[in-house]
Regions:
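Short, positionally conserved secondary-structure boundary motifs
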Residues: 1-57, 94, 123-128
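Short, well-ordered loop/turn sites that connect or cap secondary structure elements
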Residues: 55, 68-70
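Short, surface-exposed charged micro-motifs
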Residues: 87
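Glycine- and charge-enriched low-complexity intrinsically disordered segments
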Residues: 91-128
Length: 128
């Protein structure tokens, strides 16, 4: 379980701030995410408000650390030792970083950004 609230600073080695690591039952994983798990899939515990309402604090994000080629989608990336989970949109001559929560401004993805993983699914914390 990767807690991304206080992040400073190929798989788990890409994350500097790991609070807990756990293993989930394969059947549970398939039931919740409707896909077969792979070694590069990780579950991240979201603790941010910048992507509300898409996901909120307490939701679990399924990420793939092998999917680092940028297309339109939600990614975990690092800039200046700071972790972000944001929507990336390819625009002519730039990549736009977008928060789904409109209280946060968009900005251009810096050229030195390091893509850590792509968010490929979500399990809402209030899902039974």
């Amino acid at each position: 379980l990767l807690n991304i609230k206080d992040y400073k600073g190929s798989d788990l080695a890409k994350f500097d701030n790991i609070h807990d690591v756990f293993t989930v039952d394969r059947e549970w994983f398939i039931d919740v995410f409707k896909k077969q798990p792979t070694p590069t899939m990780k579950i991240v515990f979201a603790q941010c408000e910048s992507m509300q309402p898409t996901f909120t604090q307490g939701d679990f994000l399924l990420v793939d650390t092998d999917d680092t080629n940028i297309n339109d989608g939600v990614y975990i990336f690092k800039v200046d030792d700071r972790l972000f989970i944001k929507r990336l949109q390819i625009m002519p001559g730039k990549i736009l970083v977008i928060s789904d929560n409109k209280k946060y401004e968009s900005f251009n993805l810096p050229s030195d950004a390091v893509i850590i993983a792509k968010v490929i699914d979500l399990w809402k914390h209030d899902t039974p």
